[in-house]
C-alpha cells in the first residue's frame, strides 16, 4: 500500500501535534517549603509560583531516595536506584561506577520516540566518558559531572583554602571537557549560565521537525551557594539570594517558550532531587512542617515540591494530595509522548490520568529506601517506619562560621506508625493503637522488599 505525499505530511503533523515538548527542571537540595506557592515567606519565587497557578501542584510528591545520584537515577530510569546498584550514593570524582549503559534513560527513550534531547546542569550519574550524557541518549549537553561542593575550595564564599581531596570541578559540553568552575566568580555565575544555555537549547530546537526534551538540573541551591550580583546580599538569607537567582532562570526558560510560540505545546515540570541539607543553617532550605531533611526517610528528606503545567491538558490552579514520585516521570512522559516501554522492568507508574483530571494517581503506596535498606512504607494516611538508624538534624552542634555544616547526630527509630493526615511531623507514634495497620504495612514492606531483591541489575563499571 502506498500513501500520497500529502497524506504522509498530514500524518506526520498529527503525530507531532500529539507529542508535546517537555521541559523537566530539577533543583538540588530544595525543600518542600522553599517556594512561595508552598508557603515560603522568605524566598522570592514569582516565576515558579506563577507556574503553579497555571498548572498542577502536588503536596505528596516524593524523591525516591534523599541523596543526589540515587534520586537522579530514579528520575532518569523509573527504577528504584538500589535496583541498579546506585542506592544511597553521591558519586564523586573519578568514580569507577555509574549508571549502566544497559539501562535506558528518559533521554534515550524519548530520542527513540523522535525527540531532540538535551541536558543542562548537574548530571551525577558517573563522570567517566561511558557514563556521560552522550552515552545515555542526549543529543546536546552542558553539564557538571557531580555536585558543586566537590571542588578544591570550601563551602564559604571567598574561602580560598584548597582541599586536596578534590580536583578542579570540570565542565563538559557534549561529552568533551571545556574548562572548570575555577573560583567563586564562576560559582556565582553558575545558575545564570545554566539558564542561558537552556534558553539557547529552546531557541535552537523549537519549531523544527522534532519535538524536544530538555532536562535542566540546576546545581543550586546545593552548597556552596552562589548567586549573581543582581541578588547577592539582597534578601534575608544567602539561600534566599540563590532561590531568587534560580527563579529568574526558570522565568527565562518560560519566556523562551513564549518567545518561540511553543508554550501551549510544552509540558513543564519543576521539582527537587531531595529535601534540604538542614545542617547548613541560613545556607539551607526548609522542609516546613515535615521532620528531618536530606539523607533521611522522614518526610522532610523525601517529600519535595512538584509542579506540572501542560496547557490544554492540566487544568490551571489545581492542587492534589495524590501519591506520586520521581520514578513515575518515565512511564508518565512515555505515555504522554508516544514512547515505548523500556526493555527492562521499571518501578514507576504512569500518573497521566491524574494530569488529565482524575483524582487518583494510580499509586496506592510508596516505599522509602535509603541505600539498599527499606526503612519505611506509606499507604494512604499511614506511614510505618521499620527500625533503622538515621542522621538527625535536631539539636545539632553549631558550626564555627555561617555557611559551614553543623554537626548532626546519629539516632535510632524503632517500629513506629504515624498518621500523616493528623501528624505531618511524624511525632506521635500510634502503632500500639493500630496493630492491624502495622501488620498490614509490615506485610506490604516484606512484599516490596522481595520484589526488588528478585529484580536487581548490575551497576555500570569501568
Residue ranges and their predicted role:
Residues 2, 11-416, 424-443, 447-462:
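Formylglycine-dependent sulfatase
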Amino acid at each position: 500500500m502506498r500513501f500520497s505525499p500529502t497524506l504522509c505530511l498530514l500524518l506526520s503533523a498529527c503525530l507531532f501535534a500529539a507529542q508535546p515538548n517537555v521541559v523537566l527542571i530539577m533543583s538540588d537540595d530544595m525543600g518542600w517549603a522553599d517556594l512561595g506557592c508552598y508557603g515560603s515567606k522568605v524566598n522570592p519565587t514569582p516565576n515558579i509560583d506563577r507556574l503553579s497557578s497555571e498548572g498542577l501542584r502536588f503536596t505528596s510528591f516524593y524523591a525516591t531516595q534523599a541523596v543526589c545520584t540515587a534520586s537522579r537515577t530514579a528520575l532518569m530510569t523509573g527504577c528504584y536506584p538500589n535496583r541498579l546498584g546506585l542506592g544511597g550514593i553521591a558519586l564523586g570524582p573519578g568514580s569507577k561506577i555509574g549508571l549502566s549503559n544497559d539501562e535506558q534513560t528518559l533521554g534515550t527513550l524519548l530520542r527513540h520516540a523522535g525527540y531532540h534531547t538535551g541536558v543542562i546542569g548537574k548530571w551525577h550519574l558517573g563522570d567517566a566518558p561511558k557514563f556521560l550524557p552522550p552515552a545515555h541518549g542526549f543529543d546536546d549537553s552542558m553539564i557538571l559531572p557531580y555536585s558543586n561542593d566537590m571542588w578544591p575550595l570550601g563551602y564559604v564564599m571567598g574561602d580560598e583554602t584548597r582541599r586536596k581531596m578534590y580536583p578542579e570541578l570540570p565542565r563538559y559540553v557534549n561529552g568533551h571537557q571545556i574548562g572548570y568552575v575555577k573560583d567563586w566568580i564562576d560559582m556565582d555565575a553558575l545558575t545564570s549560565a545554566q539558564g542561558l544555555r537552556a534558553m539557547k537549547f529552546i531557541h535552537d530546537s523549537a519549531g523544527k521537525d522534532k519535538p524536544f526534551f530538555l532536562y535542566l538540573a540546576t546545581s543550586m541551591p546545593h552548597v556552596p551557594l552562589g548567586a549573581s550580583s543582581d541578588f547577592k546580599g539582597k534578601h534575608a538569607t544567602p539561600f534566599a539570594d540563590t532561590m531568587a537567582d534560580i527563579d529568574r532562570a526558570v522565568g527565562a526558560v518560560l519566556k523562551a517558550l513564549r518567545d518561540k510560540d511553543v508554550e501551549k505545546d510544552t509540558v513543564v515540570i519543576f521539582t527537587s532531587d531531595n529535601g534540604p541539607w538542614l545542617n547548613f543553617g541560613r545556607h539551607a532550605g526548609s522542609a516546613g512542617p515535615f521532620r528531618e531533611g536530606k539523607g533521611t526517610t522522614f518526610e522532610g528528606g523525601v517529600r519535595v515540591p512538584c509542579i506540572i503545567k501542560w496547557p490544554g491538558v492540566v487544568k490551571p490552579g489545581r492542587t492534589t494530595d495524590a501519591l506520586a514520585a520521581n520514578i513515575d516521570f518515565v512511564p508518565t512522559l512515555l505515555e504522554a509522548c508516544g514512547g515505548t516501554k523500556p526493555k527492562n522492568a521499571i518501578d514507576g507508574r504512569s500518573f497521566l490520568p491524574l494530569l488529565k483530571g482524575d483524582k487518583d494517581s494510580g499509586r496506592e503506596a510508596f516505599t522509602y529506601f535509603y541505600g539498599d535498606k527499606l526503612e519505611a512504607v506509606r499507604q494512604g494516611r499511614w506511614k510505618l517506619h521499620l527500625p533503622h538508624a538515621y542522621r538527625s538534624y535536631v539539636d545539632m552542634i553549631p558550626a564555627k562560621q555561617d555557611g559551614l555544616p553543623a554537626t548532626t547526630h546519629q539516632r535510632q527509630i524503632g517500629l513506629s506508625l504515624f498518621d500523616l493526615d493528623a501528624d505531618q511531623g511524624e511525632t506521635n507514634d500510634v502503632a500500639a493503637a493500630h496493630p492491624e495497620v502495622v501488620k498490614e504495612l509490615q506485610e506490604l514492606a516484606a512484599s516490596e522488599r522481595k520484589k526488588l531483591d528478585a529484580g536487581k541489575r548490575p551497576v555500570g563499571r569501568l
